[in-house]
UniProtKB/Swiss-Prot annotation:
Keywords: Autophagy, Cytoplasm, Cytoplasmic vesicle, Endoplasmic reticulum, Hydrolase, Mitochondrion, Protease, Protein transport, Thiol protease, Transport, Ubl conjugation pathway
Matches recorded under InterPro entries: ATG4_LIR (IPR046793), Papain-like_cys_pep_sf (IPR038765), Peptidase_C54 (IPR005078), Peptidase_C54_cat (IPR046792)
Organism: Gallus gallus
Protein name from the UniProt record: Cysteine protease ATG4B
Ranges spanned by the short sequence motif LIR, renumbered to the chain: 388-391
Primary subcellular site in the record, as a coarse category: cytoplasm
Keyword Lipid metabolism annotated: no
Catalytic center residues: C73 (nucleophile), D278, H280
Enzyme class: hydrolase
A Pfam family it matches: Peptidase_C54
């Protein structure tokens, strides 16, 4: 059998279970004990949406690739971290996927946003074609920063989720910019100023009620992505404790990055090992039914997740957080400030109230959906793609 087309059900026996350790297991802001909560750990992992290489999907751009094997791993990791944001947005962090159990319409709406077809909001087709505007030809490998930029642009079309996506540049998170972005949605004077919305109104096959309802809110749910370089050719060990703390925060969406020959979606850690979902398995493309439902088992990792030493992590990563409310954001800021006081933990980025004077135009990349990455982005992350190699499967 072709190794590239094996499913995880086939390979289940090859994956190690969690080590018997007193060290806590952290999964996207949740703390577990291996001894007493192993089933809960596995259920949490299984409930994350898992996107892998696919084959035999409609040709990208009509005449392009019908599979992303060998080049799409970072794109799939980008889908996974963004799917976690949509799960938190529409289903909640504590939602769980149970095999064989009928899921809600919102669940299928989230999943359909990533299906391999051209009209899905965050499909491989949309990411690859939007990437052309970022200087990436279809089939070219992306780094974590580039996929973050592309997903931000695609999110502007997702009126159902109505997200504010902020990409923090220059290792700096500016609180004032984020508040301005998240509060810019409040355009109605009050509920009476906005038209009534029927619950079954659809936009591109998705319920639109959530997006319209949020126009009555003072805060637009925030997806915060922070591209970082934590060393030159290998991760600086001074950042390791800080990175671990990111997985402990309830706002955590995880990390996209990898090691020199592959990209992974990191969802937690135990001891000195990162826990991740691996996209390097080629599965047949899935076609949704007319009702919007689809066979979904292949989108959930049903075995103990992969692990790797933190020291093996490539230094070019993107860290993600989701703040549903302004209170969530304020709490995140408080945690980041406390983290700067932890002994032996070197801050990975700076949190400031206002834009430093040496910055150029205020938040050009975050307030202008159709702007390009701009020179300063390329200046800092120019080498990110060179540190990864395409897998030959």
């Amino acid at each position: 059998m072709d190794a590239a087309t094996l499913t995880y059900d086939t390979l289940r026996f090859e994956y190690e279970d969690f080590p018997e350790t007193k060290e806590p297991v952290w999964i996207l802001g949740r703390k577990y004990s291996v001894f007493t909560e192993k089933e809960e750990i596995l259920l949490d992992v299984t409930s994350r949406l898992w996107f892998t290489y696919r084959k035999n999907f409609p040709a990208i751009g009509g005449t392009g690739p019908t599979s992303d094997t060998g080049w799409g791993c970072m794109l799939r990791c980008g889908q996974m971290i963004f799917a976690q944001a949509l799960v938190c947005r529409h289903l909640g962090r504590d939602w769980r996927w149970i095999k064989g159990k009928r899921q809600t319409d919102n669940y299928f709406s989230v999943l359909n946003a990533f299906i391999d077809k051209k009209d899905s909001y965050y499909s491989i087709h949309q990411i690859a074609q939007m990437g052309v505007g970022e200087g990436k030809s279809i089939g070219q490998w992306y780094g974590p920063n580039t996929v973050a930029q592309v997903l931000k642009k695609l999110a502007t079309f997702d009126t159902w989720s109505s997200l504010a996506v902020h990409i923090a540049m220059d290792n700096t998170v500016v609180m004032e910019e984020i508040r301005r972005l998240c509060q810019s949605n409040f355009s109605c004077a009050g509920a009476a100023a906005c038209p009534a919305v029927e619950a079954d109104v659809l936009y591109n096959g998705y319920p639109e009620e959530a997006g319209v309802r949020d126009k009555l809110s003072l805060w637009k749910p925030l997806v915060l992505l922070i591209p970082l370089r934590l060393g030159l050719t290998e991760i600086n060990e001074a950042y390791i404790e800080t990175l671990k703390h990111c997985f402990m925060m309830p706002q955590s969406l995880g990390v996209i990055g990898g090691k020199p020959n592959s990209a992974h979606y990191f969802i937690g850690y135990v001891g000195e090992e990162l826990i991740y979902l691996d996209p390097h398995t080629t599965q047949p493309a899935v076609e949704p039914s007319d009702s919007g439902c689809l066979p979904d088992e292949s989108f959930h990792c049903q075995h103990p997740p992969c692990r790797m030493s933190i020291a093996e992590l490539d230094p070019s990563i993107a860290v993600g957080f989701f703040c549903h409310t302004e209170e969530d954001f304020n709490d995140w800021c408080h945690q980041i400030k406390k983290l700067s006081l932890v002994r032996g933990a070197l801050p990975m980025f700076e949190l400031v109230e206002r834009q430093p004077s040496h910055f150029s135009n205020p938040d050009v990349l975050n307030l202008t959906p159709d702007s390009s990455d701009a020179d300063r982005l390329e200046r800092f992350f120019d080498s990110e793609d060179e540190d990864f190699e395409i897998l030959s499967l």
